[in-house]
């Protein structure tokens, strides 16, 4: 299973790879936040692997995202992406780790073509539980960035989704 870095389209201060970091005010025993570096000059992002619900990895398909790094047993679940609870300060939900693979919960995402360049990430609940005949993307939300304590944190947004590319590691 290949690993990829999620890199942004922008350069300089508009750039920055996605990485696993410690969430402010978190009491989790392991890094538990999904962030983006403040510039494309500097460290590379944390590699991820995409785990499809079924079959291969394609656009517009439900999948889990896992940071693909060596870790101690205690921290294994802290590598799987999920959408956290509503954050009152940001009035949205932040991306964090602690998700599950293959479970009908808030750990599913999709990769879709951006309206500009590259791709966007969507957070999509496992909709067959909610509504059998609904269009699948009806409940999906775009992933973008909010600034948390000076760091760029991935979060659900209404506008300006993060445009990304994938670089095989």
From Swiss-Prot:
Disulfide bonds join 30-75, 124-134. It holds the Pfam family Kunitz_legume. GO terms for molecular function: aspartic-type endopeptidase inhibitor activity; serine-type endopeptidase inhibitor activity. The record marks 93-94 as: Reactive bond for chymotrypsin. Induction: By jasmonate. The keyword Glycoprotein applies. Its main location: other. It is found in: Vacuole. It comes from the Eukaryota. InterPro entries: Kunitz_inhibitor_STI-like_sf (IPR011065), Prot_inh_Kunz-lg (IPR002160). The record marks 49-50 as: Reactive bond for trypsin. CDD domains: beta-trefoil_STI_CPI-like (cd23372). Keywords: Aspartic protease inhibitor, Disulfide bond, Glycoprotein, Protease inhibitor, Serine protease inhibitor, Vacuole. Glycans are attached at residue 1. One of its GO terms (cellular component) is vacuole. SMART domains: STI (SM00452). Inhibitor of cathepsin D (aspartic protease). May also inhibit trypsin and chymotrypsin (serine proteases). Protects the plant by inhibiting proteases of invading organisms. Belongs to the protease inhibitor I3 (leguminous Kunitz-type inhibitor) family. This is Aspartic protease inhibitor 6. It comes from Solanum tuberosum (Potato).
